[in-house]
């Protein structure tokens, strides 16, 4: 599926940057029911924002599907793991940037940022 294709791409990019993570399979083995695509073993900062997990979405982020993801997934990830990153590979509505959860609970991007925007601890 296209979703899996983009998850694998993200996995490759994380490995190239030497960012270690647990994937969904591993998290489920540890007993988590709701899991992001990647839970970082050590948090990173992207443009100064702390990121503990990354969720990959191979679609355009519009108001409707973003609202669904918030309710079904993103609030759970934030409650369990703290702030994270959601990647909408095909872009997202700019107005999502001004919602209360964005830049507080997680940040939105259209790809994994370049190395110079990432601080590794």
Model-predicted segments: where are they?
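Interdomain/boundary linker segments immediately adjacent to catalytic/signaling cores
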Residues: 1-4
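Conserved catalytic cores of phosphodiester-cleaving nucleases, focusing on short active-site segments
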Residues: 10, 14, 36-63
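A structural preference for short, hydrophobic beta-strand core positions in alpha/beta folds
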Residues: 23-24, 86, 108
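Catalytic cores of nucleic-acid endonucleases
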Residues: 51-52, 56-101
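Domain-level recognition of nuclease-like catalytic cores that cleave nucleotide substrates
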Residues: 90-121
